[in-house]
């Protein structure tokens, strides 16, 4: 996923949307901790209620669009690897709904910046590797990346039962000097870890597990 993060941000228009803009009159703001939780709910789950609350919290004309763009990255079942495999896509979505991702520690390098450590319990698909080595997903060919039927079948079974592994994911936020809403500076760390956990194929091709990097 790492090599695809910039492309994903550009495709979603997040880079432009996340630029600071003039704030509007806003309703009473939630606590910073709750605001950081909203971001996780939107990015990880695409939660509609959290998306609406985040859009209001941001307090700008772009707020709803930012929240919608962040929510769109949660739809991993729409990745090219899932095309033609609706059972695998449905299994992915069911497992994703059970993901727990909460705010851990928060560090403030400066008064108006925050580095938030999210504690996320994401599936560990290492047990899928033997099947993947026999049926790898090509990412550099003339066609969109697709799973072979053998891999899709194994994935559908394993994504439902794979053990969780806790990951600590740091995301940076900032706000205006006069206070206001916390804005995510770059959602790529959380987006990338989420995608790599559920769709590890690109990362496995780039950095085969067990090999020194």
Identify what each model region corresponds to:
Residues 74-146, 210-213:
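Surface-exposed, charged secondary-structure patches
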Residues 133-213:
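Low-complexity, intrinsically disordered terminal/linker segments enriched in charged
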């Amino acid at each position: 996923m790492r090599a695809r993060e910039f492309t994903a941000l550009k495709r979603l228009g997040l880079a432009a949307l996340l630029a600071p803009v003039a704030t509007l009159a806003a309703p009473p703001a939630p606590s910073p901790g709750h605001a950081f939780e909203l971001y996780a709910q939107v990015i990880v789950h695409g939660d509609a209620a959290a998306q609406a609350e985040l859009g209001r919290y941001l307090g700008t004309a772009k707020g709803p669009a930012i929240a919608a763009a962040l929510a769109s990255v949660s739809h991993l079942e729409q990745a090219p690897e899932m095309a033609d495999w609706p059972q695998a896509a449905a299994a992915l979505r069911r497992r994703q709904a059970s993901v727990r991702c909460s705010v851990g520690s928060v560090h403030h390098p400066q008064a108006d910046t925050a580095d938030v450590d999210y504690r996320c319990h994401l599936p560990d698909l290492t047990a899928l590797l033997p099947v993947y080595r026999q049926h790898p997903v090509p990412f550099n060919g003339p066609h969109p990346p697709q799973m072979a039927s053998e891999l899709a079948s194994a994935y559908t079974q394993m994504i439902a039962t794979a053990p969780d592994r806790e990951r600590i994911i740091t995301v940076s936020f900032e706000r205006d000097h006069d206070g206001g809403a916390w804005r995510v500076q770059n959602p790529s760390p959380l987006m990338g870890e989420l995608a790599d956990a559920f769709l590890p194929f690109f990362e496995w091709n780039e950095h085969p597990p067990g090999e020194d990097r």
